[in-house]
Every structure is written in structure tokens, then in C-alpha cells.
């Protein structure tokens, strides 16, 4: 589902992705606060699908903000093989691993997932796990609650 929000003019490019972290103190008195923050869920990764041309003033973003249309971003993560079923809806839990230097660590412990997601596809590439975990790389879409 597409949502309307505001984002810094320098960041407002179709195709860009961001993780919404919530409002800042500086946002409190702003007249645009509701459109900036009320449509987005904290911790969710969004993709910009369209950008409007008008620029609006902002105390946080030096060059102002633009109105953008966003939707939850589809992205790739790694999960345990037994959970990797196309079309299934899951509540995210990171792969149990503390090897922060592993090349797969960020995919096994992704940012920008809050709550549930749907497995849109299982990717064919093989995932090597140094701890011996059976893992799969998948594409997911967050489920809006």
C-alpha cells in the first residue's frame, strides 16, 4: 500500500530506500509533522516510488523537503531453511549467530524489519554458513498491520 510523506529534498529520488526511525524533537512545532510522521511505521524500510516537485521548508533538512509516495520495500534477507516457504507470512527473528565478521551477518540480522513479512520468493543462490546452519536467501515484503 502506497503512503504519502515528506523526505529531505537531497534524498527524494525515485527508487531510494530508507528506514523510518521516528520523529526528532525539532519536528514537534512543525506544521508538516503529521504528514511526515503519521503515515510511517518506526523500523520499517520504505522505497520511494514517486517524487513531487514542490519544495517545503524544514528545520531538520537544510534544503527543505519534498512530498514523496512510498511503499514498504521488498528486500533480501537470510533465514533458516525450514522457514523459507514462498507465500508464507512470518514474524521476523534473526538467525542465531554472533559472528559479526561473517559476510552474511547483515543479511542474517537485517535492519528495517518490524513485525511480520511475507516471503515473496526463495532465491536460488547457495548460502554458506560457517556455523553449519542450513540457510536460504529470500525476498520479503513487509506486511502492514
UniProtKB/Swiss-Prot annotation:
<dbReference type="Pfam" id="PF03684">
    <property type="entry name" value="UPF0179"/>
</dbReference>
<protein>
    <recommendedName>
        <fullName>UPF0179 protein MmarC6_0993</fullName>
    </recommendedName>
</protein>
<comment type="similarity">
    <text>Belongs to the UPF0179 family.</text>
</comment>
<dbReference type="InterPro" id="IPR005369">
    <property type="entry name" value="UPF0179"/>
</dbReference>
